């Protein structure tokens, strides 16, 4: 069987997907590789553990608060683009595609 990939927008949804797959005898990661988003506690508490993208939520919050404070203090200030580093946390819900 070909390996299928699912990128799920949130760890909680990925946990639900993982549960449904296992109930229907879909093997993770052999039949379906799952990558989730947020790298929350949920990603680490499943079996197999979910591969997840860590969006660096603490830094994201700091930058958002800073932007809001700057805008309140200087209403004419133009918003600036800020890129917060993210990281792929590889766990057990993905496998390499051979071929």
Show the residue positions of the predicted features.
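Flexible loop/turn connectors
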Residues: 1-99
């Amino acid at each position: 069987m070909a390996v299928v990939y699912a990128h799920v927008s949130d760890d909680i949804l990925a946990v639900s997907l993982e549960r449904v797959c296992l109930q229907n005898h879909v093997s993770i990661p052999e039949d379906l590789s799952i990558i989730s988003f947020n790298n929350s506690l949920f990603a680490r508490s499943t079996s197999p553990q979910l591969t997840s993208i860590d969006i660096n939520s603490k830094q994201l919050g700091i930058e958002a608060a800073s932007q809001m404070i700057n805008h309140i203090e200087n209403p004419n200030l133009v918003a600036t683009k800020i890129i917060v580093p993210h990281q792929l946390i590889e766990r057990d819900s993905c496998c390499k595609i051979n071929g």
